Amino acid sequence: DTCRRQRQMCIRDSYGADTLRMYEMFLGPIEQSKPWDTRGISGVHSFLKKFWNLFFTEGKLNIVEDEPSSESLKSLHKTIKKVTEDIEKLSLNTCISSFMICINELSSLKCNNINILSPLIILISPFAPHFAEELWFQIGNKKSIIDEAYPMYDNKYLIESDKNYPVSFNGKTKFTTVSYTHLTLPTTGIV
C-alpha cells in the first residue's frame, strides 16, 4: 500500500494531480476494484494536452467568437447530456470517455470557438479542477470557474442529421441512399 502511494505521488509529480484524478476515474466503475496499472496514464495526459491545444496555436491563445458550426454544437450538447446523465449514475469512467470523444470531434473540426469551448471547461472542472481553473483564467475570465453555472444541453442540437448509406452488391458499392431523419409521418386521416 505504501509502495502504491509512492507511485501515485511520482505520477502526480510527473503528470499533475488532474491527470492522476482523471486516470483513476477512467479505470472503470467506482464500485469495482481495479488493478493499478500506469500504462494508460499517458493517454489521459495526452487527452488533456489535446483539450488545451484547442485554445492555443504554437503557445499563443487562438480563440474566436463566431457563430458555432452545427457539428460543434451537436458535439457539445451531446457531451453535456451524456456527462450530466453519467454523473447522476456515478459512472465517472464513461464521463471521461465522453470528454475524449468530444475533444476528438472538436479537434477534427478544428474548433477554437469560445462559445463551444467555455461550456466544456465548466463541464470538465469537477474532473480536472486545476486544469479547468487555469484554462478559465487563460481565456480572460477574472472570477473563478467555481462560480459559473453548470452548462445545460439543448435537445434541438441533438437531432440526428440525414445519413448517407452506401448500398453494395457482391462487395461493390452500387449507389448511395439517404435516410432523412427529420421526416415525420402524417397522423391525420389514418384509420
What are these regions (language model features)?
Residues D1-R7, I11, H182-V191:
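Single conserved hydrophobic/aromatic residue that forms the stacking wall/gate
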Residues R12-T176:
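Helix-rich, typically C-terminal accessory recognition domains appended to large enzymatic cores
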